[in-house]
Amino acid sequence: MEPFMDEFASIGLDAVVGSVGNGATLRLFSDIKHVKYTEGRFLPYFFPDTFHEGGDPVKEAKVNWVTARRAILRSPIQRIGYGGYLKLALEFPDFVQYIKEVCQEFRVLYDNIQGTTPYCVKRVAVLNCWGKMRSWGNHMVHHAIYYKQNYSYFGIIEALSGAPFDVSFISFDDIRQDKDLLNDFDVIINVGDADTAQSGGENWADPEILTAVRKFVYNGGGFIGVGEP
């Protein structure tokens, strides 16, 4: 059951809790509809790999919060949390104090942005073979872990997660099924290696797709291709 597909609403799920590695991983669950609330579990987890003598959990927490915060402004979540062994966290009072500050900052954001629509400069469509089914996860490998072959492509999605754009993920089949679909957007972004689901592969040999995209550009729309679109 894909959370971005229409049938997801039928399962009656109360909430979605997701681990936050960066802005895109936050949008991966904050954009899910038909649930009562979404909650972000922020890093670091209270585990010995970070909470040890010489470790710097405050630095990791700051990087994580600042990276994800801009995405919260675009697509608000309702709750935040941390997890792990509390005993380890108590041994780092500076960390506890910083998390207190994060919680207060989140409360300010929550009070001011819930139920509002953020300002959007342009409407952007990310075009690939999956469309909305894999929104925000179309270039994601093992959460927010660095992956050499995919890093630059994922960086584009990460940038979009907190940018002032109304972002949608559309597929080539969406274009075939709705001749006027592209009229809803200002820019199309197509990202990926040749002959992959990310870039579209043989879809670009379809005259129907070529005609629709060329018409879109002719009428003033922007097309950004990265990699081998």
Residue ranges: model-predicted function:
Residues 1-150:
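Hydrophobic targeting/anchoring helices
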Residues 145-229:
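Helical hinge/lid and interdomain linker segments adjacent to catalytic or ligand-binding clefts
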